[in-house]
Amino acid sequence: PGGAAPPAPRGRAARGAAHAPRPPPPPPRAPASAPVIGTPWAAGPGTGTGSPSPGAGEGAPTAPGPSPGGTDRGAGDPGAGDSGAGRAPGALPFDLPGPAALRTGEAGRKLVFAHYFTPYPLSLDNASADADYYARNYLNPAGENGKHERYGGLLRDRPLPVSPKPGDWERANLEQEVRTARAAGLDGFTLDMLSLSGPNRDRAQLLMEAAHAVDPAFKVMLMPDMTSLNTDDPGVLADAVAALGKAPAAHRLGDGRLVVSPFKAEAKSVAWWTQVLDLLRTRHGIRTAFVPTFLDFDANSARFAPISHGFSEWGSRSYVGQESATRDVQRAHGLGKIWMQPVSVQDARPNQGVYDEAGNTATLRSTWTHAIDDGADWVQLTTWNDYSEGSQFAPSQHNGYTYLDLSSYYLTKFKTGSWPKIVRDTLYVSARTQFASADPTGPQSLVMSLRKGSAAPRDTVEVLSFLTAPATVRTEVGGARDAHEAPAGIHSELLPLRPGTSSAAVVRGGKAATEVELPYAADRTVRVQDLQYYAATSGRD
C-alpha cells in the first residue's frame, strides 16, 4: 500500500483447501512510529461534548432501486425490512442511530461495506457446533485427513455457533448474517467472487437473495477475485458479473450503474478490463462504475484512472504505516475519483506462515481514524469473515461482538460527522492466549513469522474503556491485580500479558458496576501457535 507496512495480499482457494501462495508484497517504505495508544484522547471523541446525538426514528419502506448514497432513491425510509436480530439493549456505549439516520442525507453518501468471504458461512453442514465441519476439520489440526497438520489446523477461530435449522438452513443463516451487519450500521457487503461454479458460486447467489429478502436497501458490491477466478476470457467474467449483477441486491449508484470492484485488479491489464466493461454494456445492457481494489495502489492508479469511477486498496494490517492512507485519499480525489478505505482489525495466517502485529485494537482504531480524518468516501471492513486470515469483524467464538461493536462507534462518526455521546460505561479487553515467541509443542512445523514492515511483536493486555465520567478501572491479569484512573471518553490502558485470564471493572464509590472477563487463559506452553488477539466486551453476555 502507500505506506511503511506492505499490503496483506491473499491467495484464494475453494472451501476446505489451503489458500494458494500469496504474491510477494511490494518493497516497504520507511517505517513510521506507532500512534500513542496508552493515553486518553484529549478533548476527544466519545465525551459527548459538542457532539449532538445523531439521527432517530424509522419510517416506511423504500422502493427497490439504487444503493444508499445514490440520487434516485425514491421515497421512504431505507431502513425498513426484516428487523431480524436487532442490537441487544445496552450492548454499546452509545445509542447507535437507526438505519434511517445512517442511510439518508450526508450519512447516506458515506458507505460502509464488509468483505464477505463465501468459504466461511455460519455453518457448513447444519450440524451441532461441537461436532460440525468447523470443529472436526478446520479447528482440529488433524482435520481433513491431516492436510492442515503442518500449520496446526486451517483456522484458529470460527463464527459464533448457530443451532441446526430445519428447511433451507443455508439461506436462513445468510439472512442472519445480513441482519447482524445491518444492526451494526453497515450498508452492505463486498462479495468476494471466488469461482465461476461450485459451492462458493452457489453461496454468492444465495447471499444476493438473502440480502434483498432481509432489507432491500442492504446492498452487495461485486468483487471478482482475480487471484482465484480461473479465466483469461473477458466474456466469461462479464457473463459471471452480469449473472449476479442483475440481482436487486447488487450495489448500484444513483444513476443506475453497477459497481464492480475487482480484488487485485492489477492482475489484468487496463485493456482487458475495458473489454469486460464493454461486454457488460453491449452484451448485457449493464452500465458500470469501476472501482478497482489494488494490492499496490501507487503503481496502478494512473494507468487505471481513465476507466475508473473510484479506487481502493487491500491495505496493511498493522497500526504502523497507516498515515500513508492520507496520501492515497488525496491522490484518488486529485484524479477525480472516490476512495474506498480499508479498515482492518488484525491478520494471522497459519497456512501461509505470516502474521501482522495488530497491537490489540490499535490497528482497528488507527484504520478507522484515518478513514474519518482523511475524508474517505466509502469504507471496506477487511474482512467480515475470512477466518483463514484471522481478519474477521463478524461475531466469532473467540471475539464475540467486540470488533463489530467498536466499529459501530467509528462508523457513526464516519457517516454522521459527529462523535456519538457515550451514555453507558463499557469495557473491552483484548489479549492473546499465548506469548508472541511461544514455540508450539505439537507436530506443527510451519509457524507464523512477522510480516516485513509490521510493528514489533508485543505481549500486552489492553483494557479499552468508554466512560461517561472519570472512574477507577480495576484490572486483574493472571492473578496480578492493579488499578488505573481513566478519564471520560475513550482510554486505552496496556498491561503486561501474564499466564491466566484477564478481567476489568469500572469502580465508582467503591462499587464495581461494569465488569468484563476474557475467559480464554494465556499460557507459556502451547501445542498450536495462535497469534490472534481474543477479545470480550462488558456490553454483552
Which residues make up each language-model segment?
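N-terminal low-complexity, Pro/Thr-rich disordered segments
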Residues: P1-G90, F94
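Glycan-processing catalytic domains of CAZymes
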Residues: G84-D459, T468-D541
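A short beta-strand segment in extracellular, disulfide-stabilized domains
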Residues: E462-L464
